[in-house]
Amino acid sequence: MDLIASRRYQPDAEEPAKIDCIMMPVSAGLGAFLEGEMFQQIQVPASSVPAGAEFGIYVSGDSMEPRYHSGQIVWVKRCEELECGDIGIFVYDDCGYLKKYDEHTPDKSQAEFFTDSYGVVHNQPVLVSLNTKYSPILISPEQRFEVVGKVLN
């Protein structure tokens, strides 16, 4: 019996989306090195890509469980700043991270590094894992730190 002719089965009419994906995974653990942007175009169901996503990147590690899992693709919109609580992709000390962004008042030993020319002490960025077995990463002003983008899924 032909299932399509019987109308008991309808093939998926959704066109696949073609989107860039960085093939080197970002760490959801202790950090993985991101060597430049190694993009490859992949095809995925269009409904799986959130509106505004500019690229995908694979997750490596368990520090963002239970929300994100190793091998999963997260969809990212490029940006240079995030709000506290946003999940993002970051480069810190030449390693790529998938973490929740937060900010803390720097301790006294670090305060001078976060003080601007007007004497205003700014908050210290902190990268937080969702898996509580991992400690937060306090961002040192002496290391390169970059917000790559916001995770949309």
Describe these PLM feature segments:
Residues 1-14:
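Helix-turn-helix-like N-terminal two-helix hairpins of bacterial/phage DNA-binding regulators
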Residues 2-3, 26, 86, 127:
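N-terminal cationic amphipathic segment used for targeting or macromolecule association
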Residues 7, 38-43, 119, 142:
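Short, flexible coil/linker elements and helix-boundary hinge sites characteristic
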Residues 11-19, 31:
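Helix-turn-helix/homeodomain-like alpha-helical modules used for DNA recognition
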Residues 22-24, 130:
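Structured loops at beta-to-helix junctions and adjacent beta-edge loops in soluble globular domains
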Residues 25-62:
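Short beta-strand/loop turn elements enriched in aromatics
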Residues 47-153:
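Acidic/glycine-rich C-terminal interaction modules and beta/coil loop segments
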